[in-house]
Amino acid sequence: MKAYLALISAAVIGLAACSQEPAAPAAEATPAAEAPASEAPAAEAAPADAAEAPAAGNCAATVESNDNMQFNTKDIQVSKACKEFTITLKHTGTQPKASMGHNLVIAKAEDMDGVFKDGVGAADTDYVKPDDARVVAHTKLIGGGEESSLTLDPAKLADGDYKFACTFPGHGALMNGKVTLVD
């Protein structure tokens, strides 16, 4: 039986090698849709700390999130010179918010654990406890392809160390960073 399989394999290889058809170009050999997960597109595979969301006299920043539970920044710089500062959260992934939803919540660093714990039971309010005084500002929970914005007074950030995080259960350990007041 082994000899029979070996003979058939050799015949198939021989016929394929002697084919009159030219070899397919390398680009066609592995379509992008069939690439393994480890070869994810650069936008989703970029390290979360690769960029800062700069203030630079600008009173707005954009933070992107993806299906890999990553923000594209670990530091949001807020200018003291701004009367209001707007942060837009864009979910660049495709997963729905029920399974891979993201929000952006700002609170003092020492309050963030409590914000997470209280948010777990608040699915109806985007995993943020209603009227939580520890929360400076937050976006709504969004799914792939959606965006949401928050606006805050930079003066609220003057008295301590602040963090931002996603409060969707289980996401905060990976999806967090600092909010830095600059200028």
Curated annotation (Swiss-Prot):
Query: How is the cofactor bound, in the record's words?
Result: Binds 1 copper ion per subunit.
- Where do the annotations place Cu cation binding? 102, 166, 171, 175
Q: Which Pfam families match?
A: Copper-bind
Region Disordered: start-end pairs: 27-51
Top-level taxonomic group: Bacteria
Main localization (coarse): membrane
MF annotations from Gene Ontology? copper ion binding; electron transfer activity
User: Know the name of this protein?
Assistant: Outer membrane protein H.8
Q: Which organism is it from?
A: Neisseria meningitidis serogroup C / serotype 2a (strain ATCC 700532 / DSM 15464 / FAM18)
